[in-house]
Amino acid sequence: MSSAGAVDLSLKIGALRLRNPILAASGTFGYGLEFAHLVELERLGGFVTKGLSREPIEGAPAPRLCETPSGMLNAVGLQNVGVRAFVAEKLPVLRKFDTAIIANVFGYTLEDYVEVLRVLEDADGLAGYELNISCPNVKRGGMQFASDPASVAEVVRAARSVVAKRPLWVKLSPLVTDIGLIARAAEEAGADALTVANTYPAMAIDYRTGKSRLGNQTGGLSGPAIKPITLRLVWEARKAVKTPIVGLGGVETVEDVLDYLAVGASAVQVGTASFLTRRPVSDLLRVLKVSFVDVIRLLSMRYEVNFSQKTVDIMMFSCYTF
């Protein structure tokens, strides 16, 4: 317990200490600055920047977002200013906020990942990195880096070779036959933590025109629809590795957070919920009153779930979403 009787929800993901287990997910929080007037960034456990590439990317054609009955489709196309512009223009402002800033990194070749990380390693103000390995490897016919253990190990080892200062998280794809094998490959190659998981390829059609509702034809499905599937992935990954896991997919309520902790995640990221409500994710920490002992118990449960023994004390969760 901290002063004034406040519950201390701080934790460590590997070597990285977070104020609490709630982070803003990559792609839904921009560079953080866009939400600074709405969200007290210091109240978040941290936030993950939108993906950073070697060179600027304009992204996919509009429309880029499409709401579904149970979530959202996005096809932003990884638009970003490029790593050098991020370091020169965005990061100096972000350094003013007392929160963990995790840079999401992607590429289409091993050299892309290495170059982006080299630039970031020379910059101050970052707490760690998250590798998005769901991108196509252009040197292997467009096959995703995340699709097989050998490719995963290759890209993580390449990243690890240039990352000395900060923790390295790896964001896994849900489109794999055995998430345990993929998770183990990332762990053995040097990942400090795993983010499980990315969005699911999907589509929405306007039957009146016969055309996709997205400019890029297909997009990534996120939101409540994917939570049960991703919970299973976290559970399977937890059985395969000892590396900390950050759960991501359909987190909207206090119960969602606790569900992810119960199947073995150490923390969660909130994404689509940031688009669907005006109440910022940091509000969770204002209305949530959790027994410190029970949070620790959930964090130590790993993948063994016993719902009959769940005794977490939640205040007002029944009417709260964020």
Named regions from a protein language model:
Residues 49-50, 54, 133-135, 196-202, ...:
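Glycine-rich phosphate-binding active-site loops on the catalytic face of alpha/beta enzymes
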Residues 72-73, 136-150, 182-243:
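Glycine/Thr-rich beta-alpha phosphate-binding loop at enzyme active sites
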Residues 320-321:
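Short, positively charged and aromatic/hydrophobic N-terminal segments
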Residues 34-35, 115-119, 177-188, 251-268:
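Catalytic cores of alpha/beta
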Residues 29, 104-107, 172-178, 227, ...:
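Glycine-rich beta-to-alpha transition loops that act as phosphate-gripper elements at the mouths
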Residues 19-23, 97-102, 163-173, 239-248:
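Short beta-strand/loop segments at the ligand-binding rim of alpha/beta enzyme cores
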Residues 1-101, 106-108:
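N-terminal capping/small domains of soluble enzymes
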Residues 60-69, 205-218, 273-296:
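C-terminal helical cap(s) of enzyme catalytic domains, especially alpha/beta-barrels
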